[in-house]
Amino acid sequence: MSEIKIINGQSLPNIPWQERPADLEEGAVLWRYTENPVMGRNPTPKIGRIFNSAVVPWQDGYIAVLRGEQVNGVPHVYLGRSKDGIHWNVDRERVQFVDENGEPWMPNYAYDP
């Protein structure tokens, strides 16, 4: 890319990046990583697939909030951690929520982060 524009923010250090494919449709601003999927099936015994991750730099690597579809098909929110943004370790337990009184609360269905 000959010119990079940051809108309302600063550049994020060490974000994994692949250059724009030469055959990408004119005007397209997003493209898939050629090695997708980054996270394969069954990243933990209870999770069948990962969808719609929200990833940010954190400490000496990256942290992600993930929608993990459990093997029974019900989605819940999980955390993942990575040193390089490509290889991930996903927590085995779901994110624990609390209600407005600080009491433990677990939704029956937790979709996108």
Please state what every model-predicted region is.
Residues M1-Y111:
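Beta-rich carbohydrate-recognition and catalytic domains
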